[in-house]
Curated annotation (Swiss-Prot):
Residues 104-166 form the S4 RNA-binding domain. SUPFAM superfamilies: Alpha-L RNA-binding motif. It comes from the Archaea. Belongs to the universal ribosomal protein uS4 family. Keywords: Ribonucleoprotein, Ribosomal protein, RNA-binding, rRNA-binding. One of its GO terms (biological process) is ribosomal small subunit biogenesis. This is Small ribosomal subunit protein uS4. It comes from Methanococcus maripaludis (strain DSM 14266 / JCM 13030 / NBRC 101832 / S2 / LL). The keyword Flavoprotein does not apply. Residues 158-178 are annotated as: Disordered.
């Protein structure tokens, strides 16, 4: 059957490991979005870096193929609501930051919708299989939510969290009302 191919890394590590300012910034972002380790942040940064690299390449490409690729890039970024402008330009893509991608993670959206009290609890609910997107259980906190899926996030029907009087659920809704 042959050897399975070796998959490449999906992230790039920082060039220098001990820059205090970068470490502090990463720590704040990790706490705000409930990331477990820096690798999750680096994956999102690499994804953003790839979008920006593609935009820089397309700025210099004035052919019709370059125009088609720019439209495709805009469609992907609009599908995930990373780019929210009506008439996007490549400059809008270049001005994106890491928080625009982190806001579209399932973990962040579950917390923002009030299905969990904290980002860490949102992560726990997702990993334990209590959250469904379009009726399908999703156990990946880093799953990027498209605009179409935004309103279809709910508790799994056979989960104990689906009950209105579950202790964790009532605590989350009572804090939301205050």
């Amino acid at each position: 059957m042959g050897d399975p191919r070796r998959l490449g890394k999906k992230y790039d590590t920082p060039n220098h490991p001990w820059i205090g300012e970068r470490i502090q910034k990463e720590k704040e972002i990790s706490q705000k979005y409930g990331l477990v380790n820096k690798k999750e942040l680096w994956k999102m940064e690499t994804q953003l870096r790839n979008y920006r690299r593609q935009a820089r390449k397309l700025i210099s490409d004035t052919t019709t193929q370059g125009g088609k690729e720019a439209v495709q890039l805009f469609n992907v970024l609009k599908r995930y609501a990373i780019l929210i402008e009506e008439e996007p330009t490549l400059d809008h893509v270049l001005s994106l930051n890491i928080e625009s991608i982190l806001e579209r993670r399932l973990q962040t959206i579950v917390f923002r919708k009030g299905l969990a009290k904290t980002p860490k609890q949102a992560r726990q609910f997702i990993v334990h299989g209590h959250i469904a997107v379009n009726g399908k259980r999703v156990t990946a906190p880093a799953y990027l939510i498209s605009v179409a899926e935004n309103d279809a996030i709910e508790y799994v029907s056979n989960s104990p969290m689906a009950s209105e009087n579950h202790p964790e659920r009532t605590a989350a809704t009572s804090e939301e009302n205050q």
